[in-house]
Amino acid sequence: MQQEAAQRESEELQRVQWQPRRVRGWGVPKLLWFLVFLQPVITELHLRRRNVRFLFIRFSAWQYAGTDKLWAGLVTTLCEGIRHHYGALPFSVYSVLGNKPCGPRDGLCQREWHCRRRVCLALLALLAALCLGVGLLYLSLGGHAPGHGERGVLKALGGAATTLSGSGLLMAVYSVGKHLFVSQRKKIERLVSREKFGSQLGFMCEVKKEVELLTDFLCFLEIYQRRRLRVVLEVTGLDTCYPERVVGVLNAINTLLSDSHAPFIFILVVDPSILAACLESAGNMKGTADNGYLFLNRTVTLPFSVPIMGRRTKLQFLHDAVRSRDDLLFRELTIKLQPQSPGNLGAGEGTQLLAVETQGDAERTQGRVDAEAARRIQEALCCLHDEGDCLYEYVPDNVVSMRRIVNTVPITVRLLQQQQQQQPDRVGPTPRHAVAWVVLANQWPCRLSWVLQCLEDRQQAGGAPEGRSRLWDVFCDNSRELHTMTKALQNVLDLDGDPELFERFLGTDFPFTVAEAQSLLRCTVNLDHSIRRRMGLIRAVSALKPPSPPKSPSQDGPQASPRAIIAAGTSHAGQGSGHSKEAHQTRDRTHGGKPRPMA
């Protein structure tokens, strides 16, 4: 947008040869002169201008998430941003003495500025009255009056003229100073703090007046600077607020954009699915936004969805996330810079030497451990943004998820190193396997928790699989049972990523075994263990069979026994399930040659 604005600026300068006026530095006195004595006129020349300047203001809804009037925070941020950019004094003078730009009085007029005759005459009258009053006071007090009575009359007339003219000037200065120290933001915040006034219609009228004043000021600056102005408000963090407050912000945006000549552009940086859910769940939007996507289509004039992140872009983001970890070698550097603590002066020389040697050995050992940990962490993080490795393909196109993975890797590697120190005879996972396990737990927490829960249940039952068995095989053996629990685990299943990528991850690229999973599970910190507990409870409840009703001798003849009914139902169910299983396997063989699990 800035490049487009610069290009249009250069083209406009070549066309009209008029330089834009400055509004800062030495241009402020000229701007104040125009504000007080000249009236802007919207001419055809101004409407044909193509050069534009963008003013960017960022609004984080998270900062105002705790207030009831989130949309009021939007308006105050807008007012404060414009006031900060152009200065408090010009806006204060315009609030008191400024005039709204008007259209041309006749179609042939090309002048953009007209003299404000009323203001000039009023100012001349005040100055003349002030000079007259000062002169009369000078005559009455200087002894130039012929008589004592005339001297009193001159003194009274001079005092009245001086008081009236001076009070008029002082009132104007006082109003400018009041607007200079009391900004629009403070006004709106003061109105919001009044609970009774906030629920009345007058509150919205006052806010609308402030917004109209802001719009007129921007229109004045457009004519003065000889360029078009557009205020771009970037709204972020809206998906972290309550639905009612999200609706309030959208209503405020629609109110600000209701004027067709409003110089505002709003950019909503938000997930549309979350925004649509907020609109549908808001109580005050029933009947208006029953379908949140239709409401957004009526509100948003330019939808722009960020495309899928490319390979180079993802690697660059991962590289930046890794570089932001400035604490990888911090511990090693601080150990080298720590001053040596003085020994105990009262102890013997041998005791001091022994303590120094012991402390030196401990520091050297800890230094080697920290250096090895830093090396492993660096190796693991390099696997994330290595173009020759396939691990980056499983990282989501989300900066927040990237940082979550990068922040988890050092902790996992540290815990693995400590575990290997306790068991030096065992060969632990490599740093690449550690970061792959972190990605697995971050991308598919439900499926990974299901595999781990199945392993735990089989181990408790005494039929644990071998350590060389693959996790993918365990998942295939229990995928049908997981399919029957989709309704109970719907919210948890929504956390998982692409199922096909999960199959390729565990089946081909990273075939973790049961032994590796049990070793890595002790060092896993980014997996919610409550998911496994919930799955264990559901499996335990589904394993319970209802007791069969008691057998009645009187019903043996005319009716079949419940056992026979249950057996018949079981046989029919088995035939149906076997038929569906055969059909499913036949359908899968046409695609891959072996049956695929249902997950």
Swiss-Prot record:
Keyword vocabulary terms for this entry: Membrane, Transmembrane, Transmembrane helix
TM ranges: 25-45, 119-139, 156-176
Basic and acidic residues bias: start-end ranges: 579-591
Gene source species: Mus musculus (Mouse)
Domain KAP NTPase: 1-416
Disordered: region residues: 543-599
Listed name of the protein: NTPase KAP family P-loop domain-containing protein 1
Locations listed in the record: Membrane
Topology term for the membrane: Multi-pass membrane protein
Main location: membrane
One cellular-component annotation, GO: membrane
